[in-house]
């Protein structure tokens, strides 16, 4: 089981990656960090958010405090950047 942090996960490519990961690696935990700008839409993750292994944080990867807090609280094993 891995803990993944997916930045930009509410966009087209990021959300498809999340669905793929949940389907093929169901034991993994995923946290999506996305600022939900023009390219991201939380509704793309509606199905994924129903799963207990999926979490979401609204935030910008350029915000140092947000990123540090996510790393401190979630402690990911892998970071996948689509932001």
Listing of model-derived features with the role each one plays in the protein:
Residues 1-83:
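N-terminal Rossmann-like NAD(P)+-binding domain of SDR-like oxidoreductases, especially those catalyzing
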């Amino acid at each position: 089981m891995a803990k993944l942090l997916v930045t930009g996960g509410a966009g087209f490519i990021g959300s498809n990656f999340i669905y793929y990961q949940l389907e093929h690696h169901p034991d993994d935990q995923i946290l999506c960090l996305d600022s939900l700008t023009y390219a991201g839409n939380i509704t793309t993750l509606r199905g994924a958010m129903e799963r207990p292994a999926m979490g979401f944080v609204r935030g910008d990867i350029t915000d140092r405090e947000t990123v540090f807090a996510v790393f401190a609280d979630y402690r990911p094993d892998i970071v996948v950047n689509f932001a």
